[in-house]
Amino acid sequence: MNPNVFRNLSYGVYVVSSLDGDRNTGCIANSIMQITSSPATIALSMNHDNYTNSCIARTGKFAISILSETSDPGLIGCFGFRTGRDVNKFDDIDYTVKEGLPICRLIDKMETSTHTVFLGEVIDGDVIGSDPAMTYSYYHKVVKGKSPKNAPTYLPQEDEPASGSGAKWVCSVCGYVYDGDTYTCPICHQGKDKFRKTGNS
């Protein structure tokens, strides 16, 4: 089977958040869909290894923020390539809390071998801004990002060095490409030790 067939499915790019005690936590997700309009119900797929998964299961609450094409790539790095077990991802961003935090109330879940599919009833929501929503395709083709290993759309060949002329440095964590040899990744904030050289020198 050609695993790239899944790249033809339509996905968005979202920040999914919940509570860890009194602290907000969250991660990037791309597998979210509306199930019904009345009552408004959302389905969300999340890897068992994501810390946010256990927080949603524990609190029964979660929120979804739809990222736009103009979203700062650093937001994806912060929420997609670091774990809420180790850092407070909300420390350096502006955010709004509704209903204490959640806009969705967990109503059911289904387990697979690697992921949980959560069903949530939408309690509240709002549209902020008019920029186009970021799709998974846009993230790969324009932002040039790669999927974290916990993403349902992760493909191992994303870790392979890109071919082409000229030496480039690629962040092994998030896939960001840089033409120099001393750098800190603006997406996932990793240092030069996480970059590997690709192409011809």
Feature names for model-found ranges:
Residues M1-Y178:
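Basic, polyanion-binding surface patches
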Residues G180-D181, D193-K197:
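Short, non-ligating residues that shape and space the ligands of small metal-coordination modules
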Residues V170, T184-I187:
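The −1 position to Zn-ligating cysteines in a subset of zinc-ribbon hairpins
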Residues N200-S201:
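Intrinsically disordered, low-complexity terminal tails and linkers in eukaryotic proteins, enriched
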Residues Y178-D179, C185:
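Extracellular/surface recognition and adhesion modules
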Residues G175, H189-K192:
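Cys/His-coordinated zinc-binding microdomains
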